[in-house]
Amino acid sequence: MTETTPRPPRVLAIGAHPDDVEFHMAGTFILLGRAGYELHYMSLANGCCGSTEHGPGEAAEIRRHEAMAAAAMIGAKFHPSLVNDMEIVYDVPTAARLAAVVRQVAPRILLTHPPNDYMEDHEATCRLAVTA
């Protein structure tokens, strides 16, 4: 019989948009990493509408690279976005796709937006994360 090293507890941070994890939950996320948690980073939407200088495809690619760099900087595993900007809706297909990520990560702690927020996308992300 071989002994296995127990996997550290995991935390999954789910933001609505690229940079939401950094702006809204990075401090807590980093402290949990320092406390021994395995960190997992995800933006639900890809940031394709986040630029006035670049088209949607290029903007999404830029935002993906920025998010990957942010995740790497704090030692988090990056999980790709599931939807385009303006497509964060509380529906069964999106909840099922997010649930697959949550099941894969199996976090002890899930960080996301509050249920009452200044942006509808944030509220929908919260509902999806809680459902998942």
Map each language-model feature to its residues:
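Proline-aspartate-enriched helix->loop->beta-strand connector
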Residues: 94, 98-116, 125-126
